[in-house]
């Protein structure tokens, strides 16, 4: 299979990036030291090319009606232009088709940002649900590989305690817009020789920063400006250790179409209180929460927590969904699905290479805004 390329592919290669197949996309895993990239984001500022993710514009008079039924979270929370909401999109059995961010700009214009590997099936599902609902929404994907004739867009995630200041230095005129943004809000700024950029105060690292949605034809210039302002390129390897420390799910690993958001630590993104119906609601109400989603810290030496390892508890077995060595904590950490009866603070056993090693159950996240929340 031929891998898809983001508009920055040649630049990544010129920087010496190690490239990997990520969901059918040729993506940089690191540019040298993954741990140094991780620390740069926790302590200063790093930039990730996330143009493999897909922006989808939804337009029409009944977009809000359509999204009320499509998403598990309630888009009626979005009343101020630029406000964003994290949500899952569910199948009728309550499984997660994808997790995404929805932005509200006008009553006739909402914008989704969906995951890279799921984008084709997401679009098929959204088109089918629109047809079934008769809402007559126009669905326009904006990714470079599938943009329906619309101007293709790329995404740069600038993350870290100094990310905002360095973005302002790189993009003259952006500070007035950026300073006005609260977390999970977005605005637009016009930058000379670039055009209009969407600036969103969102991210996937547990640090402050922006996600910049940039015309694909101009994204190389924006990337170069960020590097000149002292932002360090960072790859998918650091992105994974950062999001894991932040207790953030990775689609396809921590949840998928067979997992309920209630069992993936995402109950806070599901609105079961309002009378609004949505796809998957009845299944969630009937099934309820079966398991809990927690953090683990390995206490014994001699192993690293990894996905699919069995977790043995007095209340029954569970499983690690994601695991790594945490550069910020110098500990092995994991996300895991365990029986609901296991309290935080409990020591459990993890099967690692025919050995049983002790780990402690902790509340997520492990790290937020550069600070360790566990020990």
From Swiss-Prot:
Keyword Transferase included in the entry's annotation: yes
GO cellular component: cytosol; glycine cleavage complex
Enzyme Commission numbers on file: 2.1.2.10
Record flagged with keyword Transferase: yes
InterPro entries: GCS_T, GCS_T_bac, GCST_C, GCV_T_N, GcvT/YgfZ/DmdA, GcvT/YgfZ_C, TrmE/GcvT_dom1
UniProt superkingdom: Bacteria
Gene Ontology molecular-function annotations: aminomethyltransferase activity; transaminase activity
Alphabetical keyword list: Aminotransferase, Transferase
Signal sequence range: none
Catalytically driven reaction(s): N(6)-[(R)-S(8)-aminomethyldihydrolipoyl]-L-lysyl-[protein] + (6S)-5,6,7,8-tetrahydrofolate = N(6)-[(R)-dihydrolipoyl]-L-lysyl-[protein] + (6R)-5,10-methylene-5,6,7,8-tetrahydrofolate + NH4(+)
GO BP terms: glycine decarboxylation via glycine cleavage system
Intrachain disulfide bonds: none
Subunit structure comment from the entry: The glycine cleavage system is composed of four proteins: P, T, L and H.
HAMAP family: GcvT
Protein family: Belongs to the GcvT family.
UniProt function note: The glycine cleavage system catalyzes the degradation of glycine.
Protein name: Aminomethyltransferase
Lineage: Bacteria, Pseudomonadati, Pseudomonadota, Betaproteobacteria, Burkholderiales
Name of the coding gene: gcvT
């Amino acid at each position: 299979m031929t891998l898809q390329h983001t508009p920055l592919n040649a630049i990544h290669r010129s920087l010496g990036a190690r490239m990997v197949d990520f969901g059918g996309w040729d993506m940089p895993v690191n540019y040298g030291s993954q741990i140094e990239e991780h620390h740069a984001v926790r302590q200063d500022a790093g930039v990730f090319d996330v143009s493999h993710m897909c922006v989808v514009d939804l337009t029409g008079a009944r977009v809000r009606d359509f999204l009320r039924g499509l998403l598990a979270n309630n888009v009626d929370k979005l009343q101020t232009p630029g406000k964003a909401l994290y949500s899952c999109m569910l199948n009728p059995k309550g499984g997660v088709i994808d997790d995404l961010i929805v932005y509200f700009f006008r009553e006739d214009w909402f914008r989704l940002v969906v995951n890279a590997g799921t984008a084709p099936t997401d679009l098929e599902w959204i088109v089918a649900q629109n047809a079934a609902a008769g809402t007559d929404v126009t669905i326009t994907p904006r990714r470079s590989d599938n943009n329906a004739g619309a101007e293709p867009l790329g995404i740069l995630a600038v993350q870290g305690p100094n990310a905002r200041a360095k973005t302002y230095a790189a993009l003259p005129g952006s500070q007035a817009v950026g300073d006005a943004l609260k977390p999970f809000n977005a605005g637009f700024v016009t930058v000379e020789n670039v055009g209009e950029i969407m600036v969103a105060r969102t991210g996937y690292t547990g640090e402050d920063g922006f996600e910049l949605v940039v015309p694909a034809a101009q994204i190389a210039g924006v990337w170069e400006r960020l590097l000149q302002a002292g932002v360090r390129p960072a790859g998918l390897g650091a992105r994974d250790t950062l999001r894991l420390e932040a207790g953030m799910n990775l689609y396809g690993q921590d949840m998928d179409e067979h997992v309920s958001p209630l069992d993936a630590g995402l109950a806070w993104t599901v609105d079961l209180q309002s009378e609004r119906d949505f796809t998957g609601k009845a299944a969630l109400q009937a099934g309820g929460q079966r398991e809990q989603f927690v953090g683990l810290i390995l206490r014994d030496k001699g192993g690293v927590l990894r996905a699919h390892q069995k977790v043995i508890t007095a209340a029954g077995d569970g499983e690690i969904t994601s695991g790594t060595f945490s550069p910020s904590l110098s500990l092995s950490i994991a996300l895991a699905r365990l029986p609901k009866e296991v309290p935080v603070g409990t020591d459990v056993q993890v099967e690692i290479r025919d050995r049983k090693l002790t780990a402690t159950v902790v509340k997520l996240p492990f790290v937020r805004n550069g600070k360790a929340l566990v020990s």
